[in-house]
C-alpha cells in the first residue's frame, strides 16, 4: 500500500532528545562527545513513546500510572493531615473518675437525682451516683430491658423500663421503697401483645402518655397519674393497710430482687410488692389522622356545622372537595411525574408520633371552671410522621369524651423533628424542607422562622439553658429569662448549628461544625447539652472520641475517654447519660474482644463516671457559673447608669483603643492637655 509523500512525512516520530541536522554516530567514549547547546535539541512529549505501545500493554500502562497517581494523592493527603494535626493543639483528654462494674451488658441507662438506673439482661438496677454502689436490683427471668426512663418528681422518682417484648412497666421510687404501679400494656394472650415505642411524663408527673403499636396499628394512650394518692398512702401506711391481709410469698416468676452482681447492697432499699398503689386513670386514646378523602357533605353548611367551636379547624379533615376533584388532581400529578413514579418504591413504615405535655399559657388557657395547681400540664401536643399539622389536645377530659383536637398548627411542609425545652417555655418545629419555627409558648407568639443552609436537614434539636457571655466567660443569669432561647441543631449531613432567638429580633443561625468531607471518621453521631456548664455540649464522633465544645467560642475545650481496654465498640450509637442536676455524665465502655477470655461468664462490663469538676480546665466553671441580673442589665443597658459611671466607662474604652496605637495616644493626650489649659484660663478670667 502506498501513501502520499506529504502524509508519510507527517507520520515521522522524533525520538527523545534528537538533534537538528544530519545524524552522526557518536564516538564510543563520553570524552569525545560534542558539547552541544540546549537549543540544538528538540524536546518531544514523553507520552508519545508510551502511546506507541501495542494493546493491551498501552491500557495496562495507563491503568498502572493512574493507580500510582491516586495512591500518591492519598499519601500526600495523609501526610498533610498528620502535619496539620501535629501543628494543632490537641485537647486534653481526661480519664473517668469512677467505674461501675457489671456482669451483664448494660443496654440503657438514665440519671435522676443521686441515682443511676441501668437496664440490662435480666431487668434493671439502681446505683448510687457518687459511690457507684448498687442499692437495689429488680430482675425477672427471661426479660431484657432495652430502654429506660426516669422522671424526677421532687422527693419521688418515676421509673419506666421497657423490655424486649415491648412491655412497659411503671415503677414508683420513694425513700427506701420501690413500688410497681402497673404493667401498662401487658396482656395474658401473647398474640395480642402490643409494643411500647415511646413514652412521656409531664412536668410534675401528673400525666403520662405511651405510644403503642400492634396488629398493624399505632396509637397513643394518655393517663392521669394519681401521685397525690400514692404519696398519701406511703406517708401514712397505717391508714390504708389491712393488718389481717396475708402477704403472699414471692414465687419464681414474681417481681422481686435477684442479685447477680457481687456488689455491696443497701439493706434499707427493698421492693414493696405487698403494697398496691392506685392505678393510673385512662383518659383518652389518640390515633393518627385519617387520609384525606372525598367529602361526604352535601352542602357547605354541613361543613361549618361540623367545625363549630373551631375544633379541628385546619386539620384538613372537614372540607368540601369531592372524590372527582381528587381523582382529577391525581391524574394530572401522575402524568407530570410518570418517570419518577414508575420506580419500585419500598413499603412505607407505620407512622410514628412525637408528643409533649404543655403548660398553661396565653396559647393554652384552661377553662375557668377547671382549677388545677400551677405548673400542671393542660394540653398534649403531637405531630405524626409525614404530617403537616401539630395537633393540640386538652387534658381536661374523660374517656367518654371524643378525642378531637382543640387546636391545629399547620406547617408549610411535613414536620420532621420537634423539641420542647426543659422548662416547657419554648418549642421548635423543624420541617422536612429545613425550615425551623421557633415558638415562645409562655408569651404566646413565635420567635421567628429560620432556614438551615441549603442541603441541611434537621436530625435532632437540643435546647441549651440560656446563657450570656460576661468578660469572656459563659454565665447563667440569675432569675428567669424571658423570650430568649438557644439550641443546637444536628443535621443529617453531620453538621452542627447554633440557633439563637431573642424577643422580636429575628433568629440567627451560625455553624459550629462543618460537614465532614474527607475525614468521615469525625462524623458527629450524637450531641448532649451539659446543664452544669453554661454553653457546653458533649459531641460523640464516629471514631469514638467524646469532646466538650464551647458553643460561644466554637472550640473544643477538652475530651474524655474510657481506658484502653474498654473502647466504644459501637461509637455511632453510644450509650450515655448526662446528669441534669450534677456536673457529671456516664458512658458505657464496651469490652475489647482482643483481651476477652474464652469464658464469657468472666467478662466484666463497665459504666464509667466522668466528673467535670475533677477536670482542672472545668473545675471553676461549674462553681462560678451564675451572674446577677443587675450586672447583665448594666452591660446591656449602659444608659441606665449614672452620668459619671457612663463617662468613666467611655473613657476606659477609649483608653484601651489608644493603647494599641502609641502615636494616636500621644496626640490624644496633647489635645486633652491643651483643652484643660484653656478651661483653666477661662476659670482665672472669671
Curated annotation (Swiss-Prot):
InterPro entries listed in its UniProt record: NADH_UbQ_FeS_4_mit-like, WD40/YVTN_repeat-like_dom_sf, WD40_repeat_dom_sf, WDR93_beta_propeller
Any single Gene Ontology cellular-component annotation: respiratory chain complex I
One Gene Ontology biological process: electron transport chain
Feature: compositional bias, Basic and acidic residues: 29-40
Region feature Disordered, mapped onto this chain: 1-40
Top-level lineage group: Eukaryota
Keywords: WD repeat
WD repeats: 410-449
Biased composition range(s): Polar residues: 1-10
PANTHER family according to UniProt: NADH-UBIQUINONE OXIDOREDUCTASE, WD REPEAT-CONTAINING PROTEIN 93
Name the record gives this protein: WD repeat-containing protein 93
Species of provenance: Homo sapiens
Gene: WDR93
Amino acid at each position: 500500500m502506498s501513501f502520499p509523500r506529504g502524509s508519510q512525512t507527517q507520520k515521522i516520530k522524533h525520538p527523545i532528545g534528537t538533534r537538528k541536522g544530519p545524524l552522526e554516530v557518536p564516538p564510543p567514549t563520553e570524552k569525545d562527545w560534542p558539547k552541544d547547546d540546549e537549543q540544538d535539541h528538540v524536546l518531544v512529549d514523553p507520552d508519545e513513546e508510551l502511546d506507541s505501545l501495542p494493546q493491551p500493554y498501552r491500557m495496562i500502562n495507563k491503568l498502572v500510572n493512574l493507580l500510582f497517581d491516586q495512591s500518591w494523592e492519598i499519601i500526600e493527603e495523609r501526610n498533610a493531615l498528620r502535619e496539620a494535626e501535629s501543628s494543632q493543639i490537641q485537647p486534653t483528654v481526661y480519664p473517668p473518675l469512677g467505674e461501675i462494674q457489671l456482669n451483664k451488658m448494660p443496654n440503657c441507662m438514665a440519671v435522676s437525682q443521686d441515682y443511676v438506673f441501668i437496664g440490662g439482661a435480666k431487668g434493671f438496677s439502681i446505683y448510687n451516683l457518687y459511690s457507684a454502689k448498687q442499692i437495689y436490683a429488680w430482675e425477672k427471668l427471661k426479660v431484657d430491658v432495652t430502654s429506660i426512663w426516669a422522671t424526677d418528681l421532687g422527693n419521688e422518682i418515676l421509673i419506666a423500663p421497657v423490655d424486649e417484648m415491648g412491655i412497659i412497666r411503671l415503677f414508683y421510687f420513694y425513700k427506701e421503697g420501690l413500688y410497681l404501679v402497673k404493667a401498662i400494656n401487658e396482656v395474658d394472650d401473647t398474640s395480642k401483645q402490643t409494643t411500647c415505642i415511646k413514652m412521656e411524663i409531664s412536668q410534675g408527673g401528673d400525666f403520662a402518655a405511651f405510644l403503642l403499636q400492634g396488629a398493624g396499628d399505632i396509637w397513643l394512650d394518655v393517663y392521669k397519674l394519681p401521685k397525690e394518692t400514692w404519696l398519701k398512702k406511703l406517708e401514712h401506711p397505717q391508714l390504708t393497710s389491712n393488718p389481717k391481709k396475708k402477704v403472699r410469698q414471692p414465687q419464681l416468676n414474681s417481681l422481686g430482687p435477684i442479685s447477680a452482681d457481687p456488689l455491696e447492697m443497701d439493706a434499707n432499699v427493698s421492693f414493696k410488692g405487698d403494697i398496691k398503689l392506685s392505678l393510673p386513670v385512662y383518659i383518652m386514646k389518640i390515633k393518627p389522622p385519617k387520609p384525606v378523602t372525598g367529602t361526604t357533605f352535601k352542602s357547605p353548611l354541613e361543613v361549618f356545622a361540623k367545625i363549630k367551636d373551631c375544633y379541628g379547624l385546619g386539620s384538613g379533615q372537614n372540607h368540601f372537595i369531592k372524590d372527582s376533584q381528587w381523582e382529577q388532581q391525581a391524574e394530572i400529578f401522575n402524568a407530570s411525574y410518570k418517570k419518577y413514579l414508575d420506580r419500585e418504591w419500598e413499603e412505607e413504615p407505620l407512622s410514628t408520633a412525637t408528643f409533649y405535655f404543655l403548660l398553661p399559657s396565653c396559647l393554652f388557657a384552661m377553662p375557668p371552671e377547671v382549677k388545677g395547681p400551677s405548673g400542671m400540664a393542660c394540653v398534649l401536643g403531637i405531630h405524626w410522621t409525614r404530617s403537616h399539622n401539630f395537633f393540640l389536645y386538652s387534658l381536661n377530659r374523660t374517656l367518654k369524651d371524643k378525642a378531637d383536637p382543640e387546636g391545629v398548627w399547620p406547617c408549610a411542609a411535613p414536620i420532621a423533628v420537634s423539641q420542647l425545652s426543659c422548662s416547657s417555655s419554648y418549642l421548635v418545629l423543624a420541617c422536612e424542607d429545613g425550615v425551623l419555627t421557633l415558638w415562645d409558648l409562655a408569651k404566646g407568639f413565635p420567635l421567628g422562622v429560620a432556614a438551615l443552609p441549603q442541603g441541611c436537614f434537621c436530625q435532632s434539636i437540643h435546647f441549651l439553658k440560656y446563657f450570656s457571655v460576661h468578660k469572656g466567660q459563659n454565665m447563667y443569669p440569675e432569675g428567669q429569662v424571658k423570650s430568649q432561647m438557644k439550641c443546637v441543631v444536628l443535621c443529617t449531613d453531620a453538621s452542627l448549628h447554633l440557633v439563637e432567638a431573642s424577643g422580636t429580633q429575628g433568629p440567627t443561625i451560625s455553624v459550629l461544625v462543618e460537614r465532614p468531607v474527607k475525614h468521615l471518621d469525625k462524623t458527629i453521631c450524637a450531641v448532649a447539652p451539659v446543664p452544669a456548664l453554661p454553653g457546653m455540649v458533649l459531641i460523640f464522633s464516629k471514631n469514638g472520641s467524646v469532646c466538650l465544645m464551647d458553643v460561644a467560642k466554637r472550640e473544643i475545650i477538652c475530651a474524655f475517654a474510657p481506658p484502653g481496654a474498654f473502647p466504644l465498640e459501637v461509637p455511632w450509637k453510644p450509650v450515655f447519660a448526662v446528669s441534669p442536676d450534677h456536673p457529671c455524665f456516664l458512658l458505657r465502655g464496651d469490652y475489647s474482644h482482643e483481651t476477652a477470655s474464652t469464658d464469657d461468664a468472666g467478662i466484666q462490663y463497665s459504666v464509667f463516671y466522668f466528673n467535670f469538676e475533677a477536670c482542672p480546665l472545668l473545675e471553676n466553671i461549674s462553681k462560678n457559673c451564675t451572674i446577677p441580673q443587675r450586672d447583665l442589665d448594666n452591660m446591656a443597658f449602659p444608659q441606665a447608669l449614672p452620668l459619671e459611671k457612663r463617662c468613666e466607662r467611655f473613657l476606659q474604652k477609649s483608653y484601651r483603643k489608644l493603647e494599641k496605637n502609641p502615636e494616636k495616644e500621644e496626640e490624644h493626650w496633647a489635645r486633652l492637655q491643651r483643652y484643660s489649659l484653656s478651661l483653666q484660663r477661662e476659670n482665672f478670667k472669671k
